[in-house]
From Swiss-Prot:
Source domain of life: Bacteria
Noted pH dependence of activity: Optimum pH is 7-8.
GO terms assigned for molecular function: hydrolase activity
Annotated EC: 3.1.3.-
Record note on quaternary structure: Homodimer.
Protein name: NADP phosphatase 2
Top enzyme category: hydrolase
Length: 23
């Protein structure tokens, strides 16, 4: 299972990638 902190980090990276893609 993935630790919560690592899961949150992956989520943040995905959000940043989407934000960069939309800009």
């Amino acid at each position: 299972s993935i630790p919560a902190s690592q899961k949150a980090n992956l989520g943040n990276q995905m959000i940043m990638a989407v934000a960069c893609y939309q800009n």
